[in-house]
Amino acid sequence: MKTKIRNIFILAVIIFSKSGFAISYTLDDYTKNPFGNILFVRHALAPGYGDPQNFDLNECSTQRNLNGIGREQAYRIGENIKEAGIKFLKIYSSQWCRCMETAEYMNLGKITVEPGLNSFFQGIMPKEKTLSILRERLKSIEAKQQLVLMVTHQVTITAVTGITVSSGGAVAFNTKSGESKELMILD
């Protein structure tokens, strides 16, 4: 019986370690002991699932967008980051309206559109091409070792870091080591 319990425990540890299970890292922890050079932030709350069938990248009315709670959430994320004294040399966002709006409400600086941060969840964008673009961007940042903010989607964050976060969630990522830590940016 003890062997069976031990084996189940070991299996659980393996599963969680491979599925992106992470110990939370607070903004206070982050400012005291900075980790990585990329901060991935998932767009704030945009009720629903996926995007409508009539999705058009250039037309926000055809996309799933932030609601009032999502806009407030994005604003609070920005305020928390400012209060922690964290500054970014560059801010990138997916082309999706909910990501751009999240970055705008965070109000942390000039936003640059980055197609490598786009969602490939419903096949609207090709996964491999999108991730290839993102990998090239990450390589260019790695060489400079600058702190960069990337506002994107859950599927993109998970594909790069192995960690799944909720709306408004964040992951600190080290482009050199490939390691990542979930960062609690909302109080």
Task: State the predicted function of each range.
Residues 17-19:
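N-terminal signal peptide c-region/cleavage motif recognized by signal peptidases
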Residues 1-9:
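Bacterial N-terminal signal peptides that target proteins for export
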Residues 36-38, 146-152:
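Generic beta-sheet signal
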Residues 84-86, 141-145:
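Glycine-rich phosphate-binding loop signature in dinucleotide/nucleotide-binding domains
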Residues 23-116, 120-123, 163-187:
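Active-site-proximal alpha-helix that buttresses catalytic centers in soluble enzyme cores
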Residues 125-133:
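Short, surface-exposed amphipathic charged segments that create phosphate/polyanion-binding patches used
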Residues 132-142:
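A short, acidic, amphipathic alpha-helical segment used as a generic capping/interface helix at domain edges
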